[in-house]
UniProtKB/Swiss-Prot annotation:
Classification of source organism: Eukaryota, Fungi, Dikarya, Ascomycota, Pezizomycotina
SUPFAM superfamilies, alphabetized: P-loop containing nucleoside triphosphate hydrolases (SSF52540)
Annotated EC: 3.6.4.-
Gene3D superfamilies per UniProt: P-loop containing nucleotide triphosphate hydrolases, Tandem AAA-ATPase domain
Protein's UniProt name: Chromatin-remodeling ATPase INO80
Binding annotation for ATP: D846, E847, M848, G849, L850, G851, K852, T853
Residue ranges constituting the Helicase C-terminal domain according to the UniProt record: 1403-1563
Family in the record: Belongs to the SNF2/RAD54 helicase family.
Function: ATPase component of the INO80 complex which remodels chromatin by shifting nucleosomes and is involved in DNA repair.
Cellular component aspect of the GO annotation: chromosome, centromeric region; chromosome, telomeric region; Ino80 complex
Organism name: Phaeosphaeria nodorum (strain SN15 / ATCC MYA-4574 / FGSC 10173) (Glume blotch fungus)
Highest rank taxon of the organism: Eukaryota
Length: 1673
């Protein structure tokens, strides 16, 4: 078999190779027990085989067999590898089949670097398809390549090896010896000149095998070393295969590749191979590589003897000295090829066997699945039938019962209709009889109409009985009698429309007449009898045609036809014949189709009846089948029905008894509640009386020492002081001589028994509590500066002002104060000092502009000067007034060091280092005395402020803490301070609750438990302000007595004679057309009933009403708040120039001629080059002068020479003598284009036209003979317009021009607009000559000067050089027709229309013109910042100088803006938002205040107008308030007047004024907003609905009443002014003056105690609601 003993020895040594664990390649699969398994190579034992084939020393790395499971693409030729189950697509390869005729291939295709493809697709070790137990590779790893192969097959899907690994492994491969002669293959000659002669794939049979050499370190070479017959030749120096010789000495880095179950790229984490085997000593023993666990189960062949150790050692030593392996000998390649072919064949056999087994297993599996699924299907079908068979049977029975019921209904309906027909026929007969017996014609007509009506109803009922409704198409046909046999009558006559006798009421039909109770009962009895007969199984009575009815109908119709007036006409007359022909035509055109339709309807009805009869007959035929079960079913049904009726009866009886018992219990409970309510009312009345008495006594004791009434009555005006009431108000109880017992027992409020105690005991308890409260306040004030138990006597104790308590004289002005206080201000200082003595807090509520700031500063100066109390003082003010406080303190008291506590968090941290918390006493040299900060920052840093002990805390604009639910109010209440002073010009803004919040803040111990007290006063006083009812004078007097000791208020007119009263004017404006349209649309979208429901409901719908109010207010302000008029321009079909940065373009960017049309006309380059056009001369154009020489001269009839000759010969150009033109001029005109001729004509003077102005008589006209043909020039009327430049003659000569200008046609808007605009089509040619020619044409100086004239610089040069006037080129471009749009079609919004679109803005425009002429300066207040944006555009349009301040203005910008307005008299208007610009700023340089839209809180407007009406104002202040009449603004203004009445009544003590208030209740905000949106009638409906709802809720049982959840939402103030009035350093909103609900500590907040579930979907923040109202969302 083998031709060489070396090959036999190689085969015989195969078993030894397997025994020694040589690294042979195996397949990843094996066959064992006829079940192929595709798994990892290391999981299965090797396949047993009697004679394993010889294998080479090196292996080829192939992908695993699992890749055969992947789908293959059949679009190209496919090669299947049976040893690896891997398919590879080839471009130029044969079918992968084993063919012994092909040249043999060896597995060692990658032994040498020159034989390996440039990029091998296999990066995994080759494995045998038979015995795959482990993956290994030879110690000498084949080199890897980094280049792609250039063979005829595609690259594999495996990842290539990195170049570093490839170069590192190339040095391990040695070339064969130089003198080694191998057998040439079939294609060695063809591969000698190829750079990469071998393909990498295993089964490519078109290539010869490469020369292989044995690995000297493989076990096959070791075992065969002792039996080699021929010694190898002497080793020659190896030839270098690499260009880089440095790689030859580098040891190779072999890689073990992890075997994957699928064909995937080789992993990157490869374990390094042992490289020490190549550098072993000559006689060192070689340790075999440890095989895998699968190799341990390999059976060692028993016929092979055990090797001798000595021989092995000798062989190893011989191999190490040898330079080539056993495969380098002669004949080895041939044996290697035979071994490879046998391996391939064996692999194919294994695969074919596996394929057959796989098919059998698949068939068996599918058969088993089919049987199992069939069994499941049968079982499911059987189960479904068992489960749903009863339901199906019941459904069929229910359908039959329903059909039976429907049939019964049809029968009843049929009987009712037949009865109706009979009744109508009887009525008709009766009416006809009465008509025959009628005495007068009117009564006869009435009865005939009744007869016709009955006949129509009978006809309609008959048609309904037949199954079709009466059609309008057959109304003019005489109604027929009931034809019970079907079909229609053969005789008919045309008649008038029966429906024209009278107009129908409404859109409803006549319908059938109402039946009486007797008729309905009779029909019910008849139907019950029929049903009983059906239930018994009796046969129904047959329904026979009613012959009498049909005959009666015929008789009646005949009688009706005889009623008509007989008109006898001769049959021979033409009128009769014409009438007869017309009737025949009408019958053929109208009546015949109608009769056909009637016939068709009758036929369909008859067929339907027959079909129903057949169905009934079929059902009767099946009746005998159901008689067996019907009686039993009917009995059960009747029994069940009887049981149900009995149960319903007893349930109804029990329910009635239960309801009656509940009603009795409810009545008893209501009676008990009434008794308890009366007792509780009496108890509450005594309780409130006790609280008032206690507070009056406290106020009486404090008022004696503070002398508030005396100071408040004091004034600079003697008349006012004299007119004041002389006697002081007396308290509600007798306190004369009551000094009280200081040691009396104090009774807690909870321990009082208001039911049993008498009035004397309660009065005594009230007096004791009042004295105790006074003593407690004084003790707390004395002990404030002695927290550590210091002694009162001592020289250093200067902070206890007890010595001031008995001082009677007024204190003088402090010397530290660098100003002179007015008399009322000095009295205010004395009042504040007295409060400080008693340890009582107070409210300084002087009107805005009376110097509350300087009075507060004077108190601090007085304490520092008189008692050496230098602080610490805390001043808390709105962010807008912080700079003002700092400047005022530094100006009036320079000795007080002020810390401006604002800025970033880091800055505030530095400022807090100056605070001295260890020492109580502050001296003149302390680092600070006064801290000035804002409300927001104080609340934010409350933890630091609470650690300080403040001597005096002043709160400016104290209405910021008017809500007792806000976190601001709660935080400030916890500050440690000896005294608190509240400064506010408006102590009451909306209701009495706000006043009591301030009182509780200054005296927590006294006003702590006065919720009922506050509710009492609030209800009575506010109801008086709204309903104009009589106020309880005793309550009002007692309230004023309570407030007197704690609040001091003076008004300007009482204390300042030089400051005149401000004039307030309401300016009413009308809605414009556009505003009315918007307003009407909004009103139409509101459902009044929906609005009524929202108004009387709870407060959940308040957000919707808020949005509606905002929308209406925006309409009143300006319609552009909804939609702005945009700039319009036509669609531009062009592209514009673009630049990445304007900084690179320089200061002047030239944008002329930068637009490009999207349409480009490409011109061939040949035309643009030299010689492309014949008329353009050039070096490549030899025929350039052809056109000029021949066409322009020889062939041109307009040449001067030709025209001169023809003119002399009286030929074609003889007319030149009458045209006043020479031959040269005519030739020039002929050669010029249209533009040049127009320029020539426009620049030449028209002398012929001037003759017409001189000789304008018809009989005396001058016509020059040489210009007879110049008709246009002679008839030109242009010279007539230049005769005169003034007077009537000019107007007569320029009628068209003057009329055009006078009628405004030059400024009117065009009636049409261009839809699109585009520059000229762009000409493109890749030639520089074309570009230059375009530039010459576009920028021709002569043409440009003629069109546009010369530039200003050129004209100046001509004037300087004194050139002739003809050198100045005039502008010949005609002026645009429309002076507004000119040459462009871009339309900007009209500012004049912008002004006239709003009634307010138009009225304001006229008002500002007058104010500007009168040298006034204006403060313009707005509610909406978007309206301020629009106003800026208006002021810019009118060229008024203005400045702006709103909520978004930063703090430093705000200070500079106010300073600029105060110092710069050229600023005419100051735009401000009401909340941002209405607090604490001085704008006395303005004398006019305009409210563009008013605030619903009148105190906000009062504060805003007092920015100008304050101390320092020397001019009369006028306040204008713009109100849109007939809109929501009038109702808002009325509500603001009600709030002003509350303030006047509470503070000034006056009675109710003559203000026209309505009788509405102010119980919830939702109702008020609903009232703003409706008129008076709708308001009355809301009041009525509310009363009904209250009554229903009162009468409802306790369990039925709906629970009203108290929901706190942002009111309209917060919503409208969100983001305004906050001047934080970071330019962020700091919270509105009224704390917005939802903040920390507010009820209903998400993080509070009650806000567990958070906000609902309807609940939105104020900012979100404002965005919705503005239309931004």
């Amino acid at each position: 078999m083998f031709r060489d003993p070396v090959l036999r020895r190689s085969v015989d040594g195969e078993g030894e190779t397997m025994q020694q664990g040589d690294h042979q390649a195996h397949s990843p699969t094996q066959t064992q027990g006829h079940q192929p398994r595709i798994h990892s190579a290391t999981n299965y034992p090797p396949h047993q085989q009697s004679r394993p084939p010889p294998s080479p020393s090196h292996t080829t790395e192939l992908p695993p067999i699992s890749t055969a499971l992947h789908s293959r693409d059949t679009s190209a030729s496919k090669y299947y590898d049976p040893t690896s189950d891997h398919g590879e697509r080839g471009l130029a390869r044969d079918t992968a089949r084993y063919d012994p005729q092909h040249s043999p291939q060896t597995r060692e295709t990658h032994t040498y670097s020159d034989a390996r493809p440039a990029h091998s697709p296999y990066e995994k070790p080759y494995q045998s398809p038979i015995a795959s137990s482990y993956a290994h590779q030879s110690p000498l790893q084949r080199p890897l390549s980094q280049h792609h192969h250039t063979g005829g097959m595609e690259a594999m899907s495996h990842s290539p090896v990195s170049p570093s690994v490839y170069h590192a492994n190339r040095g391990a491969v040695q070339p064969p010896p130089a003198n080694y002669a191998r057998r040439p293959s079939m294609k060695d000659e063809a591969r000698e000149n190829r750079p990469f002669p071998l393909q990498h794939h295993l089964l490519t049979v078109t290539q010869a095998p490469p020369p292989t050499r044995a690995d000297p370190m493989s076990l096959s070479s070791i075992m065969s070393a002792g039996t080699d017959s021929d010694p190898p030749a002497k080793a020659q120096p190896p030839a270098s295969l690499n260009h880089d010789h440095g790689h030859l000495s580098k040891p190779p880095n072999a890689h073990f590749v992890k075997q994957e179950p699928m064909a995937s790229p080789a992993p990157a984490d490869l374990a390094p191979h042992d490289n020490g085997i190549l550098h072993r000593a000559p006689y060192d023993p070689i340790h075999p590589v440890a095989p895998s666990h699968a190799l341990q189960s390999f059976a060692t062949p028993r016929d092979l003897p055990a090797p001798d150790e000595a021989e092995i050692e000798a062989a190893l030593a011989h191999i190490e000295t040898k330079q080539m392996n056993d495969l380098d000998g002669p004949g080895a390649p041939f044996e290697h090829e035979e071994w490879r072919e046998r391996s391939l064949k064996r692999g194919l056999d294994v695969i074919s066997g596996e394929t057959v087994k796989r098919k059998k297993r698949r068939h068996a599996t599918l058969t088993r699945y089919h049987d199992v699924l069939a069994a499941h299907r049968d079982y499911a079908k059987h189960s479904y039938n068992l489960e749903h068979e009863g339901d199906a049977w019941q459904q069929v029975q229910s359908q039959e019962i329903a059909e039976e019921k429907e049939r019964k209904k049809d029968m009843q309906r049929k009987r009712r209709r037949e009865k109706t027909i009979q009744n109508e026929e009887a009525k008709r007969a009766e009416a006809l009889a009465k008509a025959g017996q009628a005495d007068n014609e009117e009564e006869k007509e009435r009865h005939l109409a009744a007869a016709q009506k009955a006949e129509r109803k009978a006809k309609n009922t008959s048609q309904l009985l037949q199954g079709n409704a009466p059609s309008k198409d057959i109304r003019e046909v005489t109604p027929h009698g009931p034809n019970l046999e079907g079909g229609t009558m053969s005789s008919f006559q045309a008649s008038d429309d029966l429906g024209t006798g009278g107009k129908r009421k409404g859109n409803r039909g006549t319908g059938r007449l109402k039946k009486s109770k007797e008729q309905k009962q009779a029909e019910k009895d008849a139907a019950a009898a029929g049903q009983a007969a059906i239930d018994r199984g009796d046969d129904l009575p047959s329904i026979a045609p009613r012959e009498e009815a049909r005959l009666g109908s015929l008789r009646d119709r005949s009688y009706t036809e005889e009623l008509g007036n007989g008109f006898v006409t001769s049959h021979d007359s033409s009128a009769y014949r014409n009438l007869y022909a017309q009737i025949i035509k009408d019958l053929a055109r109208k009546d015949v189709p109608k009769v056909v339709r009637i016939k068709e309807n009758s036929l369909s009805t008859k067929q339907s009846n027959l079909r129903k009869t057949a169905q009934l007959a079929a059902k009767e035929a099946r009746r005998w089948q159901m008689r067996t079960n019907k009686n039993q079913k009917d009995t059960q049904a009747r029994a069940k029905r009887g049981m149900r009726e009995m149960l319903a009866f007893w349930k109804r009886n029990e329910r009635d008894e239960r309801e009656s018992r509940k009603n009795a219990e409810r009545q008893e409970l209501e009676n008990a509640k009434k008794v308890e309510a009366e007792r509780e009312a009496n108890r509450q009345k005594r309780k409130l009386n006790f609280l008032i008495s206690q507070t009056e006594l406290y106020s009486h004791f404090i008022g004696k020492k503070a002398r508030t009434a005396e100071i408040e009555r004091s004034t600079d005006d003697a008349e006012t002081a004299a007119s004041a009431p002389a006697e002081a108000e007396k308290p509600g109880i007798d306190v004369d001589g009551m000094d009280g017992n200081p040691t009396a027992k104090v009774t807690n409020f909870e321990d009082l028994d208001f039911d049993n105690d008498d009035e004397s005991a309660l009065n005594a308890a009230a007096m004791a509590n009042a004295q105790h409260a006074i003593q407690e306040a004084q003790d707390r004030a004395r002990a404030f500066n002695n927290p550590e138990g210091q002694e009162d006597d001592g020289e250093l104790n200067f902070q206890n002002p007890s010595g001031l308590q008995n001082k009677e004289d007024w204190i003088p002005q402090p010397k530290l104060l660098n100003c002179t206080l007015k008399e009322y201000q000095l009295k205010g200082l004395n009042w504040l000092v007295n409060l400080y003595e008693q340890g009582i807090n107070g409210i300084l509520a002087d009107e805005m502009g009376l110097g509350k700031t300087v009075q507060s500063i004077s108190v601090m100066a007085y304490l520092a000067e008189r008692y050496n109390i230098w602080g610490p003082f805390l001043v808390i003010a709105p962010a807008s007034t912080l700079h003002n406080w700092q400047q005022e303190i530094a100006k009036f008291v320079p000795d007080l060091n002020v810390i401006p506590y604002w800025g970033t968090a880091k800055d505030r941290k530095v400022l807090r280092k100056l605070w001295d918390r260890k020492h109580v006493t502050y001296t003149r040299d302390s680092p600070f005395h006064v801290v000035v900060s804002s409300y927001q920052l104080v609340v934010q840093d409350a933890q630091y402020f609470q650690k300080m002990r403040w001597q005096y805390m002043i709160l400016d604009e104290a209405q910021a803490i008017k809500s007792s639910n806000s976190s601001r109010w709660k935080s400030l209440l916890n500050f440690h301070s000896r005294n608190r002073l509240l400064l506010t010009g408006t102590p009451i803004q909306n209701n009495m609750q706000e006043l009591w919040a301030l009182l509780h803040f200054i005296m927590p111990s006294l006003f702590d438990s006065h919720d009922e007290f506050s509710e009492w006063f609030s209800k009575d006083i506010e109801s008086h302000a709204q309903s104009n009812t009589k106020l309880n004078e005793d309550q009002l007097r007692r309230l004023h007595m309570i407030l007197k000791p704690f609040m001091l208020r003076r008004v300007k007119k009482h204390v300042q004679k030089e400051l005149g009263d401000k004039i307030e004017l309401d300016v009413y404006c009308d809605l414009t057309y556009r505003q009315r349209a918007y307003y009407a649309n909004l009103r139409n979208k509101i459902s009044i009933m929906d609005l009524i429901e929202k108004a009387v409901g709870d407060e959940q719908d308040s957000a919707t009403l808020m949005n509606l109010v905002m929308q209406f207010r925006k309409v009143c302000n300006h319609p552009d708040l909804f939609e702005r008029a945009d700039t319009w321009s036509p669609f531009t079909f062009a592209s514009f120039a673009e630049t990445p940065s304007f900084l690179r373009e320089g200061q002047n960017v030239r944008v002329a001629y930068t637009t490009r049309n999207f349409i480009e006309y490409s011109l061939p380059r040949l035309i643009g080059r030299n010689g492309g056009r014949l008329e353009i001369a050039g070096p490549d154009n030899e025929k350039a002068g052809f056109r000029g020489h021949y066409l322009d001269n020889l062939f041109n009839i307009w040449s001067p020479h030709n025209m001169e000759q023809s003119a002399r010969e009286a030929d074609a150009h003889s007319w030149l003598r009458f045209s006043d033109l020479s031959a040269t001029e005519v030739s020039k005109i002929a050669k010029s284009d249209l533009f040049e001729r127009a320029l020539e004509t426009g620049s030449s003077p028209n002398k012929l036209g001037q003759y017409e102005t001189l000789y304008d008589d018809e009989n005396d006209k001058y016509e020059p003979k040489h210009s007879m043909l110049r008709i246009i020039d002679r008839k030109d009327r242009a010279p007539l317009t230049d005769l005169t430049s003034e007077g009537y003659m000019r107007n007569l000569m320029n009628v068209s021009q003057s009329a055009f200008e006078r009628t405004g046609l030059d400024v009117i808007e065009p009636c049409a607009k261009p839809a699109a605009a585009a520059p000229p089509v762009e000409l493109y040619c890749a030639s520089q000559d074309v570009i230059a020619e375009k530039q010459r044409v576009f920028f021709n100086p002569a043409i440009r000067n003629a069109l546009y004239g010369v530039s200003d610089k050129t004209e100046q040069v001509l004037l300087d050089t004194k050139s002739h006037s003809t050198a100045l080129v005039r502008n010949t471009l005609p002026s645009p027709t429309n002076a507004r749009t000119r040459y462009t079609h871009i339309e900007a919004p009209s500012m004049s229309r912008f002004v006239t679109d709003s009634g307010k803005l138009a009225r304001l425009d006229a008002l500002l013109k007058g104010l500007k002429a009168g040298d006034h300066r204006v403060l313009l207040y707005f509610q909406m910042t978007r309206m301020i944006d629009l106003m800026e555009e208006y002021l810019t349009y009118r060229n008024y100088k203005y400045c702006r301040l709103d909520g978004s203005t930063k703090l430093e910008d705000r200070r500079d803006t106010v300073a600029d307005f105060q110092s710069d008299p050229t600023i005419f208007v100051f735009l401000l938002s009401t909340r941002a610009g209405g607090l604490g700023i001085n704008l006395t340089s303005a004398d006019t205040v305009i409210f563009y839209d008013s605030d619903w809180n009148p105190t906000i407007d009062s504060q805003a107008m007092d920015r100008a009406h304050r101390l320092g104002q020397t001019r009369q202040v006028t306040v204008y308030r713009l109100i849109t009449s007939g809109t929501i603004e009038e109702r808002i203004r009325k509500r603001a007047l009600q709030k002003e009445e509350v303030q006047r009544v509470v503070i000034s003590g006056g009675a109710g004024g003559a203000v026209d208030f309505n009788t509405r209740s102010r119980e919830n905000r939702t109702k008020d907003m609903a009232m703003w949106l409706v008129d008076d009638e709708q308001a009355a409906e809301i009041e009525k609905k509310e009363a009904e709802l209250a009554e229903a809720e009162k009468n409802a049982p306790p369990g039925k009443k709906r629970s009203k959840k108290k929901r706190v939402e942002a009111n309209l103030d917060d919503m409208y002014h969100e983001g305004e009035g906050h001047f934080d350093e970071s330019a962020k909103g700091s919270g509105a003056a009224t704390p917005v609900p939802g903040t920390e500590g507010a009820p209903g907040a998400p993080g509070g105690k009650k806000g567990k579930k958070g906000l609902s979907k309807k609940a939105k923040t104020a900012k979100q609601r404002l965005a919705v109202a503005d239309g931004e969302v």
